[in-house]
Amino acid sequence: MGYLKRFALYISVMILIFAIAGCGKGNETKEDSKEEQIKKSFAITLDMYPIKNLEDLYDKEGYRDSEFKKGDKGMWTIYTDFAKSNKPGELDDEGMVLNLDRNTRTAKGHYFVTTFYRNGKLPDEKNYKIEMKNNKIILLDEVKDDKLKQKIENFKFFGQYANLKELRKYNNGDVSINENVPSYDVEYKMSNKDEIVKELRSRYNISTEKSPILKMHIDGDLKGSSVGYRKLEIDFSKRENSKLSVIEFLSYKPAKK
């Protein structure tokens, strides 16, 4: 379990780094209201999906607040990773993060391959620099493994193919709120008939027949914030001590410090 907790913490820290760097009736009504607010907050970005051409983001403006300097057009950050427990005591995590600067209309990031260990051993992590031009991923580092090289160059972010209109039908989810952070979470059991579930099974060769859990997490103000983030996870894990999930986030932050 320990390495799964470390993985969750690691992902949260990574997202923050990427985001900053580049029982009664009355209670049920309150929870339902907050659930709807969480869904509407996610809709700010999810309604943009699928973004088949990521360069379209150069012409889209997100939520602006006082953190933005005058004249700063901002930066979009898109992130997708796939985590899977392939061996006992190990967790493999692969994905990509890309920062799209609207000021310079340039996109740079990296592909990462990380292995976490249960026994306290430090993670093995490899990063490969990339850039995007004409909606095409260009590998900047030398990669001798042809299979990995092709995987990087042909990589598609979740947001490029995901049509999430089906999410609107989900209701009465499991809601968790921490007003001190603030942070908000809601979970729904998805259907194997959902198109996005079928798409993920095909792309990542997910063989388990278990219906996945949709997890929506928000750090920061529900109305929007340049210091918070929204994370979406579709979790196919079969057991508590295993991991099989796809994580995605899209954020809009100041590009100028």
Curated annotation (Swiss-Prot):
Signal peptide positions on this chain: 1-22
Keyword field contains Methyltransferase: no
Gene3D superfamilies in UniProt: 2.50.20.40
Keywords of the record: Cell membrane, Lipoprotein, Membrane, Palmitate, Signal
Domain of life: Bacteria
Cysteine disulfide links: none
One Gene Ontology term, aspect cellular component: plasma membrane
Membrane topology type: Lipid-anchor
One Pfam family of this chain: DUF576
Covalently lipidated residues, kind S-diacylglycerol cysteine: 23
Predominant localisation class: membrane
UniProt key word Ribonucleoprotein: no
Subcellular compartments: Cell membrane
Residues bearing a lipid moiety (N-palmitoyl cysteine): 23
Family according to the record: Belongs to the staphylococcal tandem lipoprotein family.
UniProt protein name: Uncharacterized lipoprotein SAUSA300_0410
Organism per entry: Staphylococcus aureus (strain USA300)
Upper classification of the organism: Bacteria, Bacillati, Bacillota, Bacilli, Bacillales
